[in-house]
Regions:
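Glycine-rich, basic loop-to-helix element that forms the pyrophosphate-binding segment
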Residues: 1-17, 38, 87
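Conserved donor NDP-sugar-binding/catalytic core segment of glycosyltransferases
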Residues: 30-64
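Membrane-embedded multi-pass helical conduit in multi-pass membrane proteins
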Residues: 172-246
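Short, acidic/glycine-rich phosphate-metal binding loop used to engage nucleotide
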Residues: 1-6, 56, 81, 105-106, ...
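Short aromatic/hydrophobic "clamp" motif used to bind/position activated sugar donors
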Residues: 22
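A recurrent flexible, glycine/aromatic-enriched loop bordering the glycosyltransferase active site
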Residues: 57-59, 73-95, 108, 114, ...
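Active-site acidic Asp-centered loop
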Residues: 25-27, 104
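Catalytic donor/gating beta->alpha subdomain of glycosyltransferases that bind UDP-sugars
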Residues: 104-164
Length: 247
């Protein structure tokens, strides 16, 4: 067995296939009974190179229910035209896999996103199959969630991918830290009240944007907590990625 990261494993498996169409999912995901039929059906059209399937969270606790909208694209926010395939639920022709050089083996945390960006850059014909569903099991606690977000951010930075959300988070906290330093140095008490108000609004916003997916009173505590944990994980992951890349 060839040793290595997920990308190495995926590429080795694909090299040893004999078929033209490769269907792919992740460990820990449960496939819908019709998944394979739905994910390969669009290939009846010869010009289709890639099929992006969909995914849903399989929550067993309120924590997992709150975590899902921080990780997955929720149905009401779905844009089928711009939906990129993820390794949880995707299929592609072996020829297009060869054309982009396979999954990037130098990346261990987000190889499927880099792979999808390569497909997009060569204008591969990508079709979204909303009924090709896999069920994803969310992380079970804050520690596991932190590590997941941290690895996402680290992987993106290593691949020179800077998502708008990550940039906004870094900007948000940089302004907050500068404002806090100004308060400590110059005793700008007005700044203290402003920061406190902004923090409370930020917590309220985290509930407002995601409560509809949870609909449980415990979400009023859990959603702000997850917002802060994911923010800190993204900041630390991005910072470490930058240090490794340019330090």
């Amino acid at each position: 067995v060839k040793k290595g990261n997920r990308a190495i494993g995926r590429n080795e498996a694909i090299r040893n296939t004999t078929g033209d169409i490769i269907a792919c999912s992740d460990a820990g995901c449960t496939l819908d009974r019709n998944w394979i039929q739905e994910i390969v059906e669009p290939f009846d059209e010869k010009n289709v190179n890639v099929v992006a399937g969909y995914y849903k969270g399989l929550a067993n606790s309120i924590f997992q229910k709150c975590l899902i909208p921080y990780v997955l694209v929720m149905p009401d926010k779905l844009n089928a035209k711009n939906f990129l395939p993820a390794s949880r639920s995707m299929a592609f022709r072996k020829s297009i896999w060869k054309k982009v050089g396979g999954f990037p083996e130098e990346f261990s945390h987000n190889e499927d996103y880099v792979f999808a960006q390569k497909l997009k850059s060569i204008k591969a014909k990508i079709v979204f199959a909303k009924d090709a569903i896999v069920y994803w099991m969310p992380r079970k606690n804050l520690k596991e969630a932190f590590i997941m977000f941290f690895r996402f951010a680290l992987g993106d930075t290593e691949a020179s991918i800077f998502r708008l959300k990550a940039v906004l988070i870094l900007t948000r906290y940089s302004v907050g830290i500068i404002s806090l330093v100004l308060f400590v140095l110059f005793r700008y008490y007005f700044m203290f009240y402003v920061l406190g108000s902004i923090f409370l609004l930020y917590c309220f916003w985290s509930v407002f944007k995601n409560f509809v997916y949870v609909k449980n009173w415990q979400a009023f505590l859990m959603l702000p907590l997850l917002q802060l944990v994911s923010d800190i994980a993204i900041i630390t992951g991005t910072t470490l990625g930058l240090l490794k890349k340019y330090g």
